[in-house]
From Swiss-Prot:
Signal peptide: none
Name the record gives this protein: Probable enoyl-CoA hydratase
Enzyme Commission number: 4.2.1.17
NCBIfam families named in the record: PRK05862.1
Job of this protein: Could possibly oxidize fatty acids using specific components.
């Protein structure tokens, strides 16, 4: 499949998606999000892909949603079409996904990064939810995911003032897992994805599911859910291989089944 707004490739067992609207600082529009949905579904369906990296350009991961596209909307149109509701598909990707963020990740761009499983940021990265300056609020999960990531006080600060925070503050706040030099960003993200993809795919996908459900369940429910997933992995060939390799002191050769 050819894409108008994305660059899509595979490197070994890693799927790499690069946002490619340089003239608009990778602003998110309907075409880009439809193409991103298609690319993610293709990678999810490809058994040869074990992890995904989502990247932007050096200047901007994504500078926000495309304001020109949404400017003329009214409430009825937006409500009936569930505007932005369909963009949640990114968070529903089943395989582990890493956001490699350089430059601006603002508004919808920050929300898109937060839909990934974790964020690796360049030292140049800038995060923020500046929707308040446009007379609106975050609409792609910013008020929800940001609060879960950094806590109420920091989320209120960022959302109510519209200010940006740099990569160092984002890492201290828990939004970002690692900060690296700009020239090492893609290498670091691909390296992490390659490591994840080298493990059992069923185990990696269940680990992702368990962590994500922890945000929705009570502790007792979450513990039961985790335990059932753990137990279910004993039905896989990879569990047998992983434990046999550990006992034999050799490297496991997972078959992803």
């Amino acid at each position: 499949m050819s894409y108008e707004t994305l660059l899509v490739e595979t490197q070994g067992r890693v799927g790499l998606i690069t946002l490619n609207r340089p003239q608009a600082l990778n602003a998110l529009n309907a075409v880009l999000m439809r193409e991103l949905d298609a690319a993610l579904k293709a990678f999810d369906a490809d058994r040869a892909v074990g992890a995904i990296v989502l990247a932007g350009s050096e200047k901007a991961f994504a500078a926000g949603a495309d304001i020109k596209e949404m400017q003329g909307l009214d409430f009825v149109d937006g409500y009936l079409a569930d505007f932005l509701g369909g963009w949640e598909h990114v968070a529903n990707a089943r395989k582990p996904m890493i956001a490699a963020v350089s430059g601006f990740a603002l508004g919808g761009g920050c929300e898109l990064a937060m839909m990934c499983d974790f964020i690796i940021a360049s030292e140049t990265a800038k995060f923020g939810q500046p929707e308040i300056t446009l007379g609106v609020i975050p609409g792609m999960g910013g008020s929800q995911r940001l609060t879960r990531a950094v806590g109420k006080a920091k989320a209120m600060d960022l959302i109510l003032t519209g200010r940006m925070m740099d990569a160092a503050e984002a890492e201290r706040s828990g939004l970002v897992s690692r900060v690296v030099a700009p020239d090492r960003l893609l290498e670091e993200a691909l390296g992490a994805a390659e490591k994840i993809a080298s493990f059992s795919l069923p185990a990696a996908m269940m680990a992702k599911e368990a962590v994500n459900r922890s945000l929705e369940l009570t502790l007792a429910e979450g513990l039961r859910f985790e335990r059932r997933l753990f137990q279910s992995l004993f039905a896989t060939e990879d569990q047998k291989e992983g434990m046999a390799a550990f006992v034999a002191k050799r490297k496991a050769e997972f078959k992803h089944r």
